């Protein structure tokens, strides 16, 4: 009995193949009616459509334009704004030059400040009060408070 049941199963598989062929025939008939025709290479033997070929990746390019697009204005308005911007830039440049002059302190390094052992002091705790007392005893410390003419004068 088991052998008799197998042929009907195989017949049902063949029927499914016929159904798939019929659906393909219907697609071909619809093409004749004016619908778009699919290429035959895209249809597999089982009636399934083949996967589409992978799209080529386009090269990504950097944008060659600024994020903010300048607004179109009349010539008179644009000139006025440019003049105001130039004044602000000059002021900023002058302030930057003053800051640079303050940072250019090129006094010589006092050899007493160099550690004689040559070892690094990273991570060590330095007691500056003891060092200050030691230098006062030696008479090498000068009072910096008297030198500041900017704050003391009125």
UniProtKB/Swiss-Prot annotation:
Biased composition (Acidic residues): 75-108, 140-154
Keyword set, alphabetical order: Chaperone, Nucleus
Ranges annotated as biased composition (Basic and acidic residues): 1-54, 64-74
One Pfam family per UniProt: CHZ
Compartment(s): Nucleus
Predominant subcellular localization, coarse grouping: nucleus
Region described as Disordered: 1-118, 135-154
One cellular component (GO) term of this entry: nucleus
The protein's role, per its UniProt record: Forms a chaperone-bound H2A.Z-H2B complex that acts as a source for SWR1 complex-dependent H2A to H2A.Z histone replacement in chromatin.
Family listed: Belongs to the CHZ1 family.
UniProt subunit comment: Forms a heterotrimer with H2A.Z-H2B, stabilizing the association of the histone dimer. Also, with a lower affinity, forms a heterotrimer with H2A-H2B.
Protein name: Histone H2A.Z-specific chaperone CHZ1
Organism of this sequence: Meyerozyma guilliermondii (strain ATCC 6260 / CBS 566 / DSM 6381 / JCM 1539 / NBRC 10279 / NRRL Y-324) (Yeast)
Record lineage: Eukaryota, Fungi, Dikarya, Ascomycota, Saccharomycotina
Gene (UniProt): CHZ1
